[in-house]
Amino acid sequence: MLKIGRNATILKNNFWFASVRFQSGGFSEKLAKGPSFADFLNMDKPLTADEAFELDRKVELPNGSIHKRLPSWLKTKVPLGTNFNRIKHDLRGSHLHTVCEEAKCPNIGECWGGKDKSRATATIMLMGDTCTRGCRFCSVKTSRRPGPLDPNEPENTAEAIKQWNLGYIVLTSVDRDDLTDLGANHIAKTIQKIKEKAPHILVEALTPDFSGRMDLVEIVAKSGLDVFAHNVETVEELTPFVRDRRATYRQSLSVLKHVKKTCPHLITKTSIMLGLGETDAEILTTLKDLLEHNVDVVTFGQYMRPTKRHLKVQEYVHPKKFEYWKEVAEKLGFLYVASGPLVRSSYKAGEYFMENLIKKRSGNPASMSV
């Protein structure tokens, strides 16, 4: 008699998810009808008017209710302001990319346009604007072999950030599975350059999983950053359907745990999207898994479908539910929790609490303000 292992159990659960949560067909049918890798390679093609306004029309939610328009809590103002325009201009001049723009983040105006520029937050996307992976929630362009790295990017990034005089910067990157070191040294060099030119700026790096290679994780963890972020994105049960198949839930947890083992002083952070069909029990399990792997900070945000090629929204989670998960996470013991429909992993990363937490851990309480 064959012994059924953990992988077989997960496989069984995955097929159950495909047949029960997506009533229109099984997992194989979903993959066949869903976006192919080629679709992700051609994401520059503009949407039609009907596709662009799809979510402003009648949407049937899992509970049977109908939303005729996008919920009011998901609408944002057109980004304006001096800071917003200045940062955008500098980015173009330095040939830099931001995940704020590439991922169509709804908070770009709020993060870039703050009246107090020391509280403004920009998220620079390193290693180009094209990823080697094709996650089914992400709007960043995809290619098996993106262009070569810009050797001047670390210097240009550091110089631009120095000129902005921000208090907090977030660095993220595309996945570069085509590179020997998967981009780890490029990220680390950028962090080191920033700290050389502007040592007062707090640096958060939202990193890939580096295919689970802990030697590469260590290169970034030891580069001088203040916050090491890596997103699990969703609950374990949904991971195979949401993320690229090379990214696994357990691998992401291992990355976060290894960072804390390597650099105990570093703050570790992750993000979870809601609205993909996850259950409360699965979210609670995820939070407990994160704590067991020594994660300090967690954020919750609403999944928004960027194009018709991506996963459909299963639920528009009400703001009160986000408040509920914030309270649950805080009671469980996370040091900081940001939770709301429009929250993204780098959303308001430079809030007072986060900055004070970092300064306290670095032994600089005199510079703290409340």
From Swiss-Prot:
Pathway: Protein modification; protein lipoylation via endogenous pathway; protein N(6)-(lipoyl)lysine from octanoyl-[acyl-carrier-protein]: step 2/2. [4Fe-4S] cluster 1 binds at C100, C105, C111, S346. Binds 2 [4Fe-4S] clusters per subunit. One cluster is coordinated with 3 cysteines and an exchangeable S-adenosyl-L-methionine. [4Fe-4S] cluster 2 binds at C131, C135, C138. Pfam families: LIAS_N, Radical_SAM. GO terms for molecular function: 4 iron, 4 sulfur cluster binding; lipoate synthase activity; metal ion binding. The keyword Coiled coil does not apply. InterPro entries: Aldolase_TIM, Elp3/MiaA/NifB-like_rSAM, LIAS_N, Lipoyl_synth, rSAM. Its cofactor is [4Fe-4S] cluster. It catalyses: [[Fe-S] cluster scaffold protein carrying a second [4Fe-4S](2+) cluster] + N(6)-octanoyl-L-lysyl-[protein] + 2 oxidized [2Fe-2S]-[ferredoxin] + 2 S-adenosyl-L-methionine + 4 H(+) = [[Fe-S] cluster scaffold protein] + N(6)-[(R)-dihydrolipoyl]-L-lysyl-[protein] + 4 Fe(3+) + 2 hydrogen sulfide + 2 5'-deoxyadenosine + 2 L-methionine + 2 reduced [2Fe-2S]-[ferredoxin]. Its main location: mitochondrion. The keyword Flavoprotein does not apply. It is found in: Mitochondrion. Residues 116-335 form the Radical SAM core domain. Its EC number is 2.8.1.8. CDD domains: Radical_SAM. It is an enzyme of class 2 (transferase). Signal peptide: none annotated. PROSITE patterns: RADICAL_SAM. Gene3D superfamilies: Aldolase class I. One of its GO terms (cellular component) is mitochondrion. Keywords: 4Fe-4S, Iron, Iron-sulfur, Metal-binding, Mitochondrion, S-adenosyl-L-methionine, Transferase. This protein may be expected to contain an N-terminal transit peptide but none has been predicted. Belongs to the radical SAM superfamily. Lipoyl synthase family. This is Lipoyl synthase, mitochondrial. The gene is lip5.
